[in-house]
Curated annotation (Swiss-Prot):
It comes from the Bacteria. Signal peptide: none annotated. Gene3D superfamilies: Leucyl/phenylalanyl-tRNA-protein transferase, C-terminal domain. Functions in the N-end rule pathway of protein degradation where it conjugates Leu, Phe and, less efficiently, Met from aminoacyl-tRNAs to the N-termini of proteins containing an N-terminal arginine or lysine. InterPro entries: Acyl_CoA_acyltransferase (IPR016181), Leu/Phe-tRNA_Trfase (IPR004616), Leu/Phe-tRNA_Trfase_C (IPR042203). GO terms for molecular function: leucyl-tRNA--protein transferase activity. PANTHER family: LEUCYL/PHENYLALANYL-TRNA--PROTEIN TRANSFERASE, LEUCYL_PHENYLALANYL-TRNA--PROTEIN TRANSFERASE. Keywords: Acyltransferase, Cytoplasm, Transferase. The keyword Chaperone does not apply. This is Leucyl/phenylalanyl-tRNA--protein transferase. It catalyses: N-terminal L-lysyl-[protein] + L-leucyl-tRNA(Leu) = N-terminal L-leucyl-L-lysyl-[protein] + tRNA(Leu) + H(+); N-terminal L-arginyl-[protein] + L-leucyl-tRNA(Leu) = N-terminal L-leucyl-L-arginyl-[protein] + tRNA(Leu) + H(+); L-phenylalanyl-tRNA(Phe) + an N-terminal L-alpha-aminoacyl-[protein] = an N-terminal L-phenylalanyl-L-alpha-aminoacyl-[protein] + tRNA(Phe). GO terms for cellular component: cytoplasm.
């Protein structure tokens, strides 16, 4: 399959995201009137019960150590929007330096991870998974720390859910989101 990296990046740079229909597998661009953002400032909240795991040595963090395994982990659900075509797109974006995996490990075991796309100072979180309890939560906290250190200004989680709300996620309307996204696209940041 030939992937048009430029066209894919243009879609993300306009605030859209790709999803496959769970039943047909057909891929389409989706937009939302409000984007769920993970704050990269003092509004981010690490739940108290998670803090010992974040500070401890239970999980080790790696970047892009097992990208394809993270994609597979994110797709391994009874109903998934990550089709085989979308997996190939993620791999092409990864090979081009735009898609990344942020992983938690226990020894040689991939415990969990987050899949996302970095464009300028924006990180668009596509999906996350875990195989060991709390692994994806620790990955989220450590990813926020990493993005802060690298100068990122936007962590787009796309759609709100109660899990993200526990970490301080908030909704931003489309117009404000577009303005922030366009600012971030002009700021060079290196993810890894």
């Amino acid at each position: 399959m030939q992937v048009d990296i430029g066209a894919i990046l243009t879609g993300y740079a306009q605030g859209y995201f790709l999803m496959a229909d769970e039943e047909t597998g057909s891929l389409a661009w989706y937009g939302t009137e409000q984007h769920a953002l993970i704050p990269l400032d003092e509004r981010f909240h690490c739940p108290r019960s998670l803090r010992p795991l974040v500070r401890g040595s239970c999980f080790q963090v790696r970047i892009n150590g097992a990208f394809e395994q993270v994609v597979e982990g994110c797709a391994a659900r009874p109903q998934t929007w990550i089709s085989s075509e979308l997996k190939q797109i993620y791999l092409a974006l990864h090979q081009a330096g735009f898609a990344h995996s942020f992983e938690t490990w226990q020894g040689d075991t991939l415990a969990g991870g987050i899949l996302g796309i970095a464009l300028g100072a924006a990180f668009i979180g596509e999906s996350m998974f875990y195989r060991i309890p709390n692994a994806s939560k620790v990955a989220l906290v450590k990813l926020v720390e990493h993005l802060r250190e690298r100068g990122f200004r936007l962590f787009d989680a796309q759609l709100m859910n109660p899990h993200l709300a526990r970490f301080g996620a908030f909704l931003m309307d489309g117009r404000d989101y577009q303005e922030l996204l366009q600012q971030c696209l002009r700021i060079p940041c290196r993810f890894d």
